[in-house]
Design a protein with these regions (language model features):
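An N-terminal hydrophobic leader/cap segment in hydrolases
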Residues: 1-24
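Active-site loop/oxyanion-hole signature of alpha/beta-hydrolase fold enzymes
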Residues: 18, 25-37, 42, 60-63, ...
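Short beta-strand element of the alpha/beta-hydrolase
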Residues: 42-50
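The serine-hydrolase catalytic nucleophile loop
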Residues: 50-63
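Alpha/beta-hydrolase active-site loop signature
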Residues: 52, 76-80, 143
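Flexible "cap/lid" loop of the alpha/beta hydrolase fold
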Residues: 120-128, 133-169
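Alpha/beta-hydrolase
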Residues: 177-179
Length: 179
C-alpha cells in the first residue's frame, strides 16, 4: 500500500463497489441505524456486532452476503448512531430491540450472525424464539452467564478506550479481550 492510499484509508473504502443503503428505522420506539444490502426477495441475514461495536463491523461482508441474502447490519441499542437509553442495558433489552427491528422490516424469520455481545444476543433469541431463527452463526459469542467482575472490567476498559482512544487504552482493552 503506498503512502497516498494509506492516508485515504477508511472503513467506507471497504464498501466501494457494494450497492447498499444506510438509514434509520424506528424499532419499537428506538431509533436504529442500519446498513442494508442485497435483494429483499431473499432470506434476511441480520448481522449483530459486539460490545462497543457498530454496523460497520460488517462492512467487508456486505457485498459477498448480498448475493445470497437480504442483509442488514445494525447499530444495536446503545451503540453507534442508534438511540442510547438512560438505563443500563441487559441482554433482554438487546433481544427485544432486535426482535422489534425484525418486525419493523417485516421479517418473520432470519438467519442471525452475532459476534461477541451480538452472539450472546443471537443465541438468546434462538433459545427463546426458535421460530424466528432460520440459522444461527456465532463468532466469539459471549456467555449466557456473565461473571459480574468480568463484565465490570470489560465495561471499564471499553469506556476508557471510548473516552480516550489512545493507543495505550485501545491496546489494553484488546489485550484483555484476547487473554
Amino acid at each position: 500500500m503506498n503512502e497516498l492510499s494509506k492516508a485515504h484509508c477508511s472503513i467506507w473504502a471497504d464498501l466501494r463497489g457494494t450497492s447498499f443503503s444506510q438509514g434509520w428505522l424506528d424499532a419499537g420506539g428506538i431509533r436504529t441505524r442500519f446498513l442494508h444490502a442485497g435483494n429483499p426477495g431473499k432470506p434476511v441475514l441480520l448481522l449483530l456486532h459486539g460490545v462497543g461495536g457498530h454496523a460497520e463491523a460488517y462492512a467487508r461482508n456486505l457485498r459477498a452476503h448480498a448475493e445470497h441474502f437480504d442483509v442488514w447490519a445494525i447499530d444495536m441499542i446503545g451503540h453507534g448512531w442508534s438511540d442510547k437509553p438512560h438505563h443500563n442495558l441487559e441482554i433482554p433489552h438487546y433481544v427485544e430491540h432486535v426482535l422489534k427491528f425484525l418486525d419493523t422490516i417485516g421479517a418473520k424469520t432470519a438467519h442471525i450472525s452475532g459476534e461477541s455481545l451480538g452472539g450472546w444476543v443471537a443465541s438468546r433469541i434462538a433459545a427463546d424464539h426458535p421460530e424466528r431463527v432460520l440459522r444461527l452463526v456465532l463468532n466469539t459469542a459471549g456467555g449466557s452467564q456473565a461473571d459480574p467482575n468480568v463484565m465490570a472490567r470489560l465495561k471499564a476498559l471499553s469506556l476508557q478506550a471510548a473516552s480516550d482512544p489512545s493507543w495505550e487504552f485501545i491496546k489494553a482493552r484488546v489485550e484483555w479481550l484476547m487473554a
